[in-house]
């Protein structure tokens, strides 16, 4: 890993995504659908991409390899998000999120097998603890009012699990031959291309809040997500997937949980508290 830049970018990503996670439900609870929230997120990627392009003189790599790798990273992330919307319609969140939360397992395996990444015994201990913490942090008590509908939800959850796990590997692989700014540009383009799909998935038969507490609230919240996505790409440029991916995915939810406790007085379940403890130890070991 190159100096400690990976750590700085990873921490910034965790902070932005942690705060984003604490507020992301507000627009939806106010009547602004999550699918349209995706469209807002895709638009907030544009100013971040503009900054990235400015850094490299407004000329991203445009050879076929760069276009394919950058677009693949974007499609895996954005398509995974859209599939998640449909997954949550078919299966309860308390079953879906523990499956998806383990996507860094895919990232770690691919990076070890295909990139030959290694880590110290101390870091490996942190990686294992982070992977154990993720399903605990996403734990939600079973609810009789939201039973699973068939088995398709599990297949869809696995698709998201694979997509997001492979995305982290692709980001690191792409960073070896192209600039991070170019990767983010293509991620933005592919995210925008899928906006019509998100709009198509929206149920316009239900009332939609188009006011200040709807899309206008979603915009600054989603901007946090977009900035975090940009710094995540930089983190993968300077750091190893086997360290960066588990760290970000384990620590960002901890920040969300702490903020939810402070802002909404939401007391986490003891299973979640156990996950927070594991994540904290993992962070110390991997830092």
Question: PLM features: residue spans?
Answer:
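Membrane-interface interhelical linkers
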Residues: 1-75, 82-90, 121, 141-158, ...
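Juxtamembrane helix-loop boundary signature in multi-pass membrane transporters
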Residues: 1-11, 105-162, 269-287
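Hydrophobic residues within membrane-embedded alpha-helical segments of Major Facilitator Superfamily
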Residues: 16, 23, 76-77, 83, ...
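Juxtamembrane helix-start motifs in multi-pass secondary transporters
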Residues: 37-38, 183-184, 244
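Alpha-helical transmembrane segments of compact multi-pass small-molecule transporters, enriched
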Residues: 44-48, 99-113, 190-194, 228, ...
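Structural signal for membrane-spanning alpha-helices in multi-pass inner-membrane proteins
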Residues: 49-56, 81-84, 108-111, 130-141, ...
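Hydrophobic alpha-helical transmembrane segments in multi-pass integral membrane proteins
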Residues: 49-56, 108-119, 164-176, 225-237, ...
């Amino acid at each position: 890993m190159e100096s400690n830049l990976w750590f700085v970018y990873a921490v910034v990503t965790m902070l932005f995504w942690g705060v984003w996670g604490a507020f992301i439900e507000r627009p939806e609870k106010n009547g602004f659908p999550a699918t349209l929230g995706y469209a807002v997120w895709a638009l907030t990627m544009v100013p971040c991409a503009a900054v990235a392009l400015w850094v490299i003189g407004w000329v991203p790599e445009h050879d076929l390899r760069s276009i394919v790798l950058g677009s693949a990273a974007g499609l895996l992330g954005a398509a995974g998000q859209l599939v998640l919307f449909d997954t949550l319609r078919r299966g309860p969140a308390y079953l879906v999120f523990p499956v998806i939360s383990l996507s860094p397992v895919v990232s770690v395996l691919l990076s070890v097998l295909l990139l030959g990444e290694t880590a110290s015994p101390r870091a490996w201990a942190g990686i294992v603890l982070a992977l154990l913490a993720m399903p605990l942090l996403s734990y939600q008590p079973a609810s009789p009012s939201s039973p699973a509908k068939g088995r398709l939800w599990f297949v869809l959850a696995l698709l998201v699990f694979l997509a997001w796990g492979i995305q982290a590997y692709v980001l690191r692989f792409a960073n070896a031959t192209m600039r991070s700014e170019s990767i983010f540009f293509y991620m933005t383009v592919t995210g925008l291309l899928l906006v019509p799909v998100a709009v198509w998935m929206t149920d316009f038969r239900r009332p939609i809040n188009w006011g200040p507490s709807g899309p206008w609230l979603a915009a600054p919240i989603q901007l946090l997500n977009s900035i975090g996505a940009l710094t995540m790409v930089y983190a993968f440029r300077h750091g190893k997937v086997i360290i960066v991916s588990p760290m970000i995915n384990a620590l960002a939810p901890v920040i969300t949980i702490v903020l939810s406790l402070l802002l909404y007085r939401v007391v986490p379940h003891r299973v979640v508290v156990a996950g927070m403890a594991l994540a904290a130890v993992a962070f110390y070991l991997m830092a």
